[in-house]
């Protein structure tokens, strides 16, 4: 990726960066299960939409209950299967990354950028495949941030974004 494309991507991300930082500042200070302001900001940033009331209640209560605990992608994924009967790899990763910003997010942009095909929703092994896919995302970030291109992008980001010290490389 050339410098102009990197610069354009960073500039385009500025609004999202401020939204992200606000969420991460609010997270430890509020009871996210009850704080509708936090939920509104989180839902807007991560595009959480069209879920029923029970889904939001379970999601944010679990997010709150896990504060201070070392949780894993697998635990979150299986919790939502057990409590909601749903396969939610993307929202599981977003909850995890809110607790531990060093953990990557699973979304279509990340998958596209690293050429990773998600497990099919109809697969009987989708949970196992999702765990493997998430490990591949983690490995990709670990390798990329040490690569010459990764170092260049991180340095440009750090130089252009004043708040970069509050944002992890994943």
Language-model regions, residue ranges each:
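An N-terminal alpha-helical hairpin/helix-loop-helix interaction module that forms a charged
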Residues: 1-85, 101-170
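Cytochrome P450 catalytic-core helices
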Residues: 92-95
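A short His-aromatic
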Residues: 98
